[in-house]
Structures are given as structure tokens and as C-alpha cells.
Design a protein with these regions (language model features):
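Active-site loop/oxyanion-hole signature of alpha/beta-hydrolase fold enzymes
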Residues: 39-44, 52-94
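Alpha/beta-hydrolase active-site loop signature
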Residues: 32, 56-60, 123
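Alpha/beta-hydrolase fold catalytic core
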Residues: 1-26, 46-50, 87-88
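The serine-hydrolase catalytic nucleophile loop
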Residues: 30-42
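Flexible "cap/lid" loop of the alpha/beta hydrolase fold
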Residues: 100-108, 112-143, 147-150
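Active-site glycine-rich loops that stabilize anionic/oxyanionic intermediates
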Residues: 21-22, 30-33, 96
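Alpha/beta-hydrolase
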Residues: 159-161
Length: 161
């Protein structure tokens, strides 16, 4: 596995690039997670080309967001990372918030998203839901990603589960 830390790049994004070949698969994690969520999928996917996993701004080992976080900002982060790594086009897969970023990226840069996969990602949320997410982002920025775990467990594993 080849690991690169891109602190020297223009956008301060931490990433791992694994495998080789002409095709690239990019994996985007969800809110409060980091690139390591893909550690079990990366080896299998690397059989098909290079696999790029990275930490979103404010997550893992990446820099804090350069502006107020939003889908357009995260879309630009990915475009800048692809530019820095000379990746013209890729298959892009995102989980939860990562899926929302994939959709935004495909709208912003349609020629760069060869194929998209959206996993367990919400669509057309209400303003109240957006506000709740933004509060979780701020909580994770202030107190670290572990601060959102208890709330996530309550949401995901209800009594009915």
C-alpha cells in the first residue's frame, strides 16, 4: 500500500493512494469519519486500478475547512486533489455525507465523474435536517469526531432495531 500525506499540496488534504493502473476509484467517507472507514474495501478495489481515499476538510488528518463547510466547498476540495494527483476522471463512491458530495461533484464537474456510487446518503433534506447536520459538523470540529458518536448510535440503533 502506498500512502501519501498531501500536507505539501495546495489544499491540505490527507489522502492514501493504493494500487496502480489507468482507472481510479475515489472513496469519500461520511460525517465524523475519515479515510480509514474504507480500509477493508481498498485492497479488493485496488485489483481494478488505483484507489484514492482521503479525509474531508475538518476530518482525520486534513486541514480545517478554508471557509464555511458546504457541499460546494467539499466538491472543490475533491477537484483540487484530483488536479494535484493528475487524475482527470474517476469512479467516485461516497457514503452518507460522502454521497451528497458525490452528487454535488457530478453536477459541478460532470466530465470528471466517470461513474458514481452513492451509499446510504440522504436526499432532499428539510432545512431542520440541514441545521442538525451543520450542528454535528461544528460539534466534530470543536470537540473532535468522537463527540458525534453517541448521537449517531442513538440515531442508527433505535429500540426497534
Amino acid at each position: 500500500m502506498t500512502i501519501f500525506n498531501s500536507n505539501g499540496t495546495s489544499n491540505g488534504t490527507y489522502y492514501q493512494l493504493t494500487g496502480s493502473g489507468k482507472s481510479t476509484i475515489i472513496l469519500i467517507h461520511g460525517l465524523g469519519l475519515n479515510h480509514q472507514m474504507w480500509q477493508h474495501q481498498t485492497p479488493a478495489l485496488a485489483a481494478y486500478g488505483q484507489v484514492l481515499c482521503y479525509d474531508l476538510y475538518g476530518h482525520g488528518q486534513s486541514s480545517p475547512p478554508p471557509e464555511k463547510p458546504g457541499l460546494s466547498m467539499f466538491s472543490r476540495q475533491l477537484a483540487e486533489l484530483m488536479d494535484a494527483l493528475n487524475i482527470k476522471q474517476a469512479t467516485i463512491m461516497g457514503f452518507s455525507l460522502g454521497g451528497m458530495i458525490v452528487r454535488r461533484f457530478a453536477m459541478d464537474y460532470p466530465d470528471r465523474a466517470e461513474t458514481i456510487a452513492i451509499l446510504h446518503s440522504p436526499h432532499q433534506r428539510t432545512q431542520a435536517a440541514h441545521d442538525h447536520i451543520q450542528n454535528r459538523v461544528y460539534q466534530a470540529q470543536k470537540d473532535g469526531p468522537d463527540a458525534t458518536v453517541e448521537d449517531a448510535l442513538i440515531r442508527w440503533f433505535t429500540d426497534a432495531f
